[in-house]
UniProtKB/Swiss-Prot annotation:
One of its GO terms (cellular component) is cytoplasm. Its cofactor is Mg(2+). Transmembrane segments: none annotated. This is Phenylalanine--tRNA ligase alpha subunit. GO terms for molecular function: ATP binding; magnesium ion binding; phenylalanine-tRNA ligase activity; tRNA binding. The keyword DNA-binding does not apply. Gene3D superfamilies: Bira Bifunctional Protein, Domain 2. GO terms for biological process: phenylalanyl-tRNA aminoacylation. Binds 2 magnesium ions per tetramer. Tetramer of two alpha and two beta subunits. It is an enzyme of class 6 (ligase). Its main location: cytoplasm. InterPro entries: aa-tRNA-synth_II, aa-tRNA-synth_II/BPL/LPL, Phe-tRNA-synth_IIc_asu, Phe-tRNA_ligase_II_N, Phe_tRNA_ligase_alpha1_bac, Phenylalanyl-tRNA_Synthase, tRNA-bd_arm. It comes from Haemophilus influenzae (strain 86-028NP).
Length: 329
């Protein structure tokens, strides 16, 4: 019996001496004591040398000692496995109190914001949006708008030509012509879209956006036009601006004017052009200028956006710099 107690203590001591709570080393001890050639297995095999009368009692004592050692080993195994699992979980633990990754949301481009702002204002006054092709014919871009053959806008250095009859439109005015050809007065339309001119510097790009307005009715007049633009500019810039109309010249309107607003620096800033639709333009689409009159407005979207948000370089709108674009979210 003393021999069995010493064997149990020896097994426990071997288990306790394992470094770093190694489960591999623990399994080696299990094999050493309880395997096919282990100490306790050998003791059970030696029972055949014991008399039949003593064998049951001796077998019970060996099993009792074996069970004590095995329970100690299994307890250590459970303890160390739990410790290993806890260490792994601690290493992989996520601190939910830390802020998570910010979900970035997209935003409208400032040019789109301006288009939406302008079209919303005029749609509430009964103007509808009309669209037209960006590859336009010489007729709709120039001839129908009373722009003669010798006009400088037709020059190669100002216009992108595909051939003598097709070009990238330089204005959305062609939409006005197409609309007047298919609709009868009264007409109230907006024509937003991309236009193209051969120019590139701090205030010009080869492609930019324009919105044009057209109103044709029997009593359309310049007084209505001035009142409409006064209201629009004050609503767009959200302040009671000083607005002035300067006489100007456009082939498709007569009389014509350019519209300025007073900037915060005390200087006048040009914002758009306008005028009464030229009688020749009305005749070109089959509308009698003696019965109907109309006015037209043309505004550069980027120009309005630059003034509203104090942007100094128009090219910034097309560089996709998130540091710039995030300011408008």
């Amino acid at each position: 019996m003393q021999h069995l107690n010493e064997l149990v203590e020896k097994a426990k001591l071997a288990i306790e001496s394992i470094q770093d709570k190694s489960l591999t080393a623990l399994d080696e001890i299990r094999v050493e004591y309880f395997g096919k050639k282990g100490y306790f297995t050998q003791l059970m095999q030696e029972l055949r040398n014991v008399s039949a009368e003593e064998r049951p009692a001796m077998g019970a004592k060996i099993n009792e000692a074996k069970q004590a050692a095995l329970e100690f080993l299994n307890a250590k195994k459970t303890e160390w496995e739990q410790a290993e699992l806890n260490a792994k979980l601690e290493k992989e633990r996520v601190d939910v109190s830390l802020p998570g990754r910010k979900v970035e949301t997209g935003g409208l481009h400032p040019v789109t914001m301006t288009i939406n702002r302008v079209t919303k204002f005029f749609s509430e006054l009964g103007f509808s949006v009309e669209n037209g092709p960006e590859i336009e014919s010489d007729y709709y871009n120039f001839d129908a708008l009373n722009i003669p053959k010798h006009h400088p806008a037709r020059a190669d250095h100002d216009t992108f030509w595909f051939n003598p009859e097709l070009l990238l439109r330089t204005q959305t005015s062609g939409v006005q012509i197409r609309t007047m050809e298919k609709m009868q007065p009264p007409i109230r339309i907006m024509a937003p879209g991309r236009v193209y001119r051969n120019d590139y510097d701090q205030t010009h790009t080869p492609m930019f956006h324009q919105i044009e307005l057209l109103y044709v009715d029997k009593k359309a007049n310049f007084t209505e036009l001035k009142g409409l633009l006064h209201d629009f500019l004050r609503a767009f810039f959200e302040e009671d601006l000083q607005v002035r109309f300067r006489p100007s010249y456009f082939p498709f309107t007569e009389p014509s004017a350019e519209v300025d607003v007073m900037g915060k620096n005390g200087k006048w800033l040009e914002v758009l052009g306008c005028g009464m639709v030229h009688p020749n333009v009305l005749r070109n689409v089959g509308i009698d200028p003696n019965e109907y009159s109309g006015f037209a407005v043309g505004m550069g979207v980027e120009r309005l956006t630059m003034l509203r948000y104090n942007v100094t370089d128009l090219r910034s709108f097309f560089e996709n710099d998130l540091r710039f674009l995030k300011q408008f979210k």
